[in-house]
A protein has these predicted regions:
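Serine-esterase "nucleophile elbow" of acetyl-processing enzymes
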Residues: 1-49, 54-59, 74-79, 85, ...
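Acidic, polar ligand-binding/catalytic clefts
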Residues: 62
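Alpha-helical cap/lid subdomain in secreted, periplasmic
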Residues: 65-212
Length: 212
């Protein structure tokens, strides 16, 4: 059996742009990935709303453990052995309060990839790594999100360029999610159900190519 760890944020968790609820397992892209690949594969979901590459939230309403780099080593140990690790983070790093460039965010993503490469828990069976650049924000994101993200739409279009460079530097696999998925037109950041299903099928094909 092949074990695939999917590490990400709310679009891996399955956040519905309609009402903020969680899509059921058979709708989330990870569920579609499992269904498409079949019983010979074990898909491990590790999505968390608000997760970043390396920054924790601050303030009275801050949610704990949002920094991916703070928890990733533990997660890798918990789910070993692994054959493939997918990493799709960076959208939450675009929040105005963090004031980060996409290049800085890509460095955060690179650190996560290096944590897999250098993990003492994966030495005997090093997994392949797939770095996924996040989708583009819709320019007309809802008002509540504009207060948090500002004009992050332009920055989000830079993800693929910088993430691909990281993948090339580290000799790992790369996928641009924006070539396959678009966020909800009504909300602008999260994916509708049909996009989850579409992306799950894309990932199934990519994972098969990597693990052949």
């Amino acid at each position: 059996m092949k074990h695939i760890l999917c590490f990400g944020d709310s679009n891996t968790w399955g956040y519905s742009p309609q009402d903020g609820s969680r899509f059921p397992p058979n709708v989330r892209w990870t569920g579609t990935l499992q269904k498409t690949l079949g019983a010979d594969y074990n898909i491990i979901e590790e999505g968390l709303n608000g997760r970043t590459t390396f920054i924790n939230e601050e303030g009275e309403d801050a949610r704990p453990f949002r920094s991916g780099s703070d928890v990733f080593s533990m997660i890798l140990e918990s789910h070993r052995p692994l054959d493939l690790v997918t990493i799709m983070l960076g959208s939450n790093d675009l929040k105005l309060e963090y004031d980060l460039s996409v290049e800085e965010i890509a460095k955060g993503a690179k650190t996560l990839c290096e944590m897999v490469i250098n993990s003492e828990y994966l030495v005997e069976h090093p997994p392949a790594i797939l770095l996924i650049s996040p989708t583009h924000f819709n320019p007309e994101i809802i008002e509540d999100e504009i207060e948090i993200f500002g004009d992050a739409s332009q920055k989000s279009h830079q993800f693929a360029e910088h993430y691909q460079k990281v993948a090339e530097e580290l000799g790992i696999h790369f996928l641009d999610a924006a070539k396959h998925v678009t966020p909800s037109q009504g909300e602008g950041i999260h994916w509708d159900a049909d996009q989850h299903i579409k992306f799950g099928k894309v990932l199934a094909q990519k994972a098969t190519e990597i693990l052949l």
